Amino acid sequence: MRQKAVFVLVRTAVLAALALAFQSLGLHQYITGPVINAILYVAALFISPWSGVAVGIITPWAAFLVGIMKFAPVIPVIIAGNVSLALISGYVGRYQKHLGLGLAAVVKFLVMTGGIKYLIMTGTKVPAPVYAAMTLTQLFTALIGAVVALAVLEGLKTFDAKRRHEST
């Protein structure tokens, strides 16, 4: 049991490091967003939904700390979106992968849009570019990330099957 926990922790740490490294490149949101979402999907489906949650909590804080995300009030909104994406894709995706990823993308968009609207309702001055980046753009980047994740997961499945076959 303990060995499995270490295995999960190491895989989660590797995906978190990959996400942080990619974020640090400072690429446009339409490139970074799909990659980070793909990593969240892969963590949730290949390791566990809670692995995806861990990566989804770490990445917005890291983006803020290194200056990629400059508007702190949206950090909880991003975390809520990432957590919803990881949990839905991880649990629904076990039974119906395409439905799980698509539903997760839509729910992430709805959660983040609702979160931004809540910030505005409570008096937070959300700059227009931040509003745009945290609403409809999230749907697009999550859907593109789902397509990337499906390809990665298929590759991991093939690699894992070969590895298991060779170890027998």
Name each model-derived stretch.
Residues 1-168:
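Loop-helix junctions at membrane interfaces
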